Amino acid sequence: MKIAVLADLHLTDNFQTVKMPVLNWALQEIARRQCDLICCIGDLTAQGSDKQTAEILEKLNSSKVRFCSTPGNAELRIYGDGKNAVKFDVPAPEGMPVVLIDTAKDEPTAEELSKLAALPDNGGFLLATHNPVRNWSSQAQEAAKLAMQRGAVTALIAGHSHHDEADILRGLDPDKASGGVPMFSIMEQLPDGAWQRSDVTMPGVDPGEWSAAEREDFFRNIGISTMWEEIAALEFACKHNIRHVELRMGLEYASELPQAIEKWRKCCGETLSLHLPDLKLNDEENKLQKFADLAYKLGCDRVTLHVPKVTAAEFENVKEKLLERFGNDLQILLENNVVIGIENLHTTSNARTFETRNFGCNIEECRMWVELLRERFGNEKIGFHLDIGHCRNNAPISGRENLSDWYSCMGDLVNGWHLHQVEHKNGEFFNHRPLSGFYDKLISLGGLFMAQRAGQLKKAPMFLEARTWEGNVEAYCKLKDLFNK
């Protein structure tokens, strides 16, 4: 008896992302391995929209392998009344030793727990649920414990947390799966009734499976942000042959900076970028223009500039003024064909609505602004600078626009990147933490790797942008080790 367990794909309404190939691979692999049943344990959709629900169920119903299912919390995001979540409540076929417990609202109801009490002693069932049993209330955990003590349940499997443990699988999401590439588990019941788990991982995603030339081609795009340590950063770049450097600095700088830049250029330098201050309606100190002049003076090949510092609600009424100021303040860069990367922003805990959040937190607004700038100034050097941390720490937008959506929808405009991790601590999210691996929480680079290999992304400098220079050194050394394995 082989049961394939699928969890946590988070498919959005965009079926052109790399998540669809993940689902197709999983279903094909399950059929190839001749599994007896597919067991879906929640969050196969990103929000439980009509479109997402219909697509997932059509895929499952088209499979040659029967399926059972229980919803996850994501299936309730749009329809909290369970309109679509209930469609994922599909009991296991008769004779299959699987009991599904609905934990879409985190805690199982008394009715759900009664399923455990009804199981026969020594039945050897697999308890499959979305929210891990250890997260249940003590009373609910006791019900599961009793079922296991009498042999009614002999194995547990859950998802939700996007990482692997004995009774938890990280799941299918290439943007969120922590600890490795997209995967599913096969739970096989042995003749003695015990269960044995084996994990099946998606091939071709991890750089360790790429050719040496492909790894080198990707890694050569990795650069660093100086984070107010320009001289030390340029020396580090020379030592490690880092081709792309972004200056994060003030208007005043050390007298030896031009010489340090020249030395780096002769050593290995290809792309020098400068992070500019915000484009604002009122800039009495002409700060943006001064930084644009500095970029030209230092010989920068490109600059990074956030989307305008206005709310989403304000934008339509002030966009002409913003376009005019952009042209005036960045005139020297536009005239000299310097690449300009427009960077996305993110919501904050007290600014998440259209009326309060900054413009340029979603895909539509970012694309519109880049295209407006290109049309106004007739300049294809203006493109999109994709900050993956800003995409991830972007509630509630991040629920419907995952990283893979940004790759799919903005990849053709990309001319630069910011790479950093997001940390969740004490109920808050913090940006600009150093990357410590390919598959961290809360950002996994699996989707980025897949999108690059699928041809969705233009090659461009990828600047590591931790909060501190030391953090960027740490991240660079870690990534270098991983790519050289």
Segments predicted by a language model, with ranges:
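Conserved beta-sheet core of the metallophosphoesterase superfamily
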Residues: E58, S137-W195
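Active-site neighborhood of phospho(di)ester-bond hydrolases with catalytic His/Asp-centered motifs
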Residues: V5-A7, L37-D43, R66-N73, I101, ...
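Conserved catalytic scaffold of divalent metal-dependent phosphoesterases
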Residues: L9-L11, D81-Q139
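Active-site acidic/histidine proton-transfer and metal-coordination neighborhood
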Residues: P120-D121, L281-G383, N393
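Histidine-acidic metal/acid-base catalytic patches
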Residues: V205-G223, E230-C238, Q289, D293-D301, ...
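N-terminal active-site segment of His-dependent metallophosphoesterases
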Residues: M1-A54
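N-terminal pre-domain/capping segments
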Residues: F15, K19, E209-D301, K485
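Metal-dependent catalytic neighborhoods of phosphoester/phosphodiester hydrolases
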Residues: T17, G42-N61, L76-K87, W136-E142, ...
